[in-house]
Amino acid sequence: MESFKYCFDNDGKKWIIGNTLYSGNSILYKVRKNFTSSFYNYVMKIDHKSHKPLLSEIRFYISVLDPLTIDNWTRERGIKYLAIPDLYGIGETDDYMFFVIKNLGRVFAPKDTESVFEACVTMINTLEFIHSRGFTHGKIEPRNILIRNKRLSLIDYSRTNKLYKSGNSHIDYNEDMITSGNINYMCVDNHLGATVSRRGDLEMLGYCMIEWFGGKLPWKNESSIKVIKQKKEYKKFIATFFEDCFPEGNEPLELVRYIELVYTLDYSQTPNYDRLRRLFIQD
């Protein structure tokens, strides 16, 4: 007879723990709700209580990604959904804490242009909501954008940043942060040690879009010093950037315009989300 490991969340729900999905700073497990089901439809993220990013992620889910607020926001705008996971459980032991979300599928790898356009709109909507709540995501990269049953999900809220100081003034641009993340998709501000602002989230999304549309990031496999140097140069010469991303000259004009608009944003500027979104809405 198979034996099961399990734990209880703060609401008393029992979660049966399956195989490890990922082991890094935090550990991800497949989990399920009961013994009768053989399907592990959920994922548990667990880490030591001393690891602050997981605590920050849990707090972000509770205080910012409130389901009722999301529902009201989407209904007011006529949006089908936001790429934000639902939280199904939070728990802790003497030494560890965890949260549970649905198994959200695989990394988004578009099969056609239509799905790319839809993904671009959904992600712009999602970032607009997060920004409207006074935060940035800070870690937009392909592995954090999943798809299941044609529904996207943006995961990993461990590096979110507050946009405003006390008094509702925008945070200042200061190059005093220790950078972290995937250098291929990192925004220039983050490379330089500044907190990711709204333009940074949208810039990182742009690098994901380039690959979704079949392009390549010219700085891949380069050192971090070369990566930031190239990104800074490409911001000055966008035409050259797209020649290197799409050597066959098949870059979508909508994507070029998106990058142009994002690259011209000031650090504290509120993006024109409608203008960005309309680039990818197909009639």
Curated annotation (Swiss-Prot):
Question: Is the keyword Nucleotide-binding assigned to this protein?
Answer: yes
Q: Which UniProt keywords apply?
A: ATP-binding, Early protein, Host nucleus, Nucleotide-binding
Protein kinase domain: which residues?
1-283
Q: Where in the cell is it found?
A: Host nucleus
Q: Where does ATP bind?
A: 1, 30
The cysteines covalently paired via disulfide bonds are none
Summarizing activity control, the record says: Both catalytically active kinases B1/VPK1 and host VRK2 repress B12 inhibitory activity in a B1/VPK1 deletion mutant strain.
Q: Which residues form the signal peptide?
A: none
GO CC annotations, alphabetized: host cell nucleus
Show the Gene3D superfamilies listed in the entry: Transferase(Phosphotransferase) domain 1 (1.10.510.10)
A GO MF annotation of the entry reads:
protein serine/threonine kinase activity
Q: Which domain of life is it from?
A: Viruses
Q: Which Pfam families match?
A: PK_Tyr_Ser-Thr
Function summary: Pseudokinase that plays a role in viral DNA replication repression by activating the antiviral protein BANF1 and inhibiting the activity of host VRK1, a cellular modulator of BANF1.
Subunit info here reads: Interacts with B1/VPK1. Interacts with host VRK1. Interacts with host VRK2.
Family note: Belongs to the protein kinase superfamily. Ser/Thr protein kinase family. Poxviruses subfamily.
Q: What is this protein called?
A: Pseudokinase OPG198
State the organism of origin.
Vaccinia virus (strain Copenhagen)
Give the source lineage, highest ranks first. Answer: Viruses, Varidnaviria, Bamfordvirae, Nucleocytoviricota, Pokkesviricetes
Query: What's the encoding gene here?
Result: OPG198
